[in-house]
């Protein structure tokens, strides 16, 4: 299982880790920087002598992660420079602490940095939680980073991407890879954010499920191996392995019904019945002969037969599809219902 968190959820888990679990913020920042350093070393340690890293650091804790990363890379023998973007007087306390420490390491920090001399660009401007369009010198910095030809790495979330929705807020850093901290952010898997994030690595920085304190993220995905199918009874038969009823496929959309039926069988259903337009009968019976067939007129009498009901794939937006939806949701079978986008369209048309 992979959790997909919002900015608000991530901030709460970060706070819980610090205040309730007793892991200090600077420790979390150091671990974030170590995770980013590990990623860079995996890619570039073999060519360290030819690798020059430029980090664009904002004034928040994401920028602090960038400063800590600069220190670690410099200590490991990399050529590193930091370009600060923003008003240092408004920097966070952790940022200021990292900045003071960085002065003892061979890291270039002056304003006259030739960006095109560097072949690894690190975005540490904003991180998670950006909610306003990127403007002014921040937008200039993003555009400057995007114009370089080097490898581009984002820390936590590419600057300019809404971490909740994946929307581009004005302009955004186009990364080759993103190292995100703690849990994956929704905006890294939703487009267009996923395209801007590139390869995504979720790093363990010490913020784990213990930080939920009873409030788990609302969204997650199943990974390979997360779903374990039940072991089938050797003495069972197709009637004991579950019955799936599919309301799918308007006239001319029989393919959607066939694909849905095949998916039901592949995920373990013993019997599958397809309720579809009468014009699709021959195509479906040829395409998946093991499935049962029923017309829309037979829907009501089929509801009690099913253990699970799916409605939506390819049913279109005609009156007949709407009547099928009403038949299902007005019955006791609605508790066994899964749906698709078309289902949501009809629900909205009924309610609004």
Each predicted region: which residue ranges?
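Generic beta-sheet signal
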Residues: 83, 112, 154-157, 181-182, ...
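Short, conserved active-site loop motifs that form the nucleotide-linked donor/cofactor pocket
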Residues: 106-107, 176, 200, 291
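Internal gly/pro-rich beta-alpha loop/helix module
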Residues: 119-120, 125-216
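Small-residue (G/A/S/T)-rich helix-start motifs and N-terminal tracts that mark the onset
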Residues: 1-81, 188-337, 343-352
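A short, aliphatic-rich alpha-helical micro-motif
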Residues: 115-119, 172, 303-304, 329
């Amino acid at each position: 299982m992979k959790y997909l968190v919002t900015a608000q959820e991530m901030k709460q888990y970060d706070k819980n880790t610090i205040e309730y679990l007793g892991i200090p913020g600077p420790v979390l920042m150091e671990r974030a920087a170590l995770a980013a350093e590990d990623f860079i070393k995996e890619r570039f340690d073999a060519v360290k002598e030819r690798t020059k890293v430029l980090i664009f650091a904002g004034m928040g804790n994401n920028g602090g992660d960038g400063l800590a990363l600069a220190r670690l890379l410099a200590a490991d023998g990399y050529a590193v420079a930091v370009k600060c973007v923003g008003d240092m007087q408004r920097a966070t306390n952790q940022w200021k602490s990292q900045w003071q420490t960085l002065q003892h390491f061979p890291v270039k920090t002056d304003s006259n940095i030739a960006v095109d001399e560097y072949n690894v660009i690190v975005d540490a401007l904003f991180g998670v939680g950006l909610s306003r369009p990127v403007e002014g010198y921040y937008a200039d910095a993003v555009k400057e980073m995007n114009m370089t030809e080097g490898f581009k790495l984002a820390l936590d979330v590419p600057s300019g991407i809404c971490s909740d929705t994946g929307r581009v807020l004005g302009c955004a850093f186009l990364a080759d890879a993103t190292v995100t901290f703690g849990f994956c952010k929704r905006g890294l898997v939703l487009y267009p954010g996923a395209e801007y994030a590139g390869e995504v690595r979720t790093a363990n920085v010490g913020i784990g499920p213990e930080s939920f304190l009873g409030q788990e993220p609302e969204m997650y995905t199943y990974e390979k191996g997360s779903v374990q199918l039940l072991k089938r009874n050797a003495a069972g038969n197709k009637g004991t392995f579950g019955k799936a009823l599919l309301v799918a496929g308007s006239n001319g959309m029989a393919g959607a019904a066939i694909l849905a039926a095949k998916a039901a069988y592949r995920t373990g259903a013993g019997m599958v019945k397809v309720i579809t337009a009468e014009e699709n009968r021959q195509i479906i019976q040829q395409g998946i002969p093991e499935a049962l067939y029923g017309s829309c007129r037979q829907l009501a009498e089929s509801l009690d037969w099913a253990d699970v009901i799916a409605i939506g794939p390819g049913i279109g937006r005609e009156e007949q599809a709407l009547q099928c939806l009403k038949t299902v949701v007005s019955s006791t079978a609605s508790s066994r219902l899964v749906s698709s986008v078309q289902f949501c369209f009809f629900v909205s048309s009924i309610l609004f």
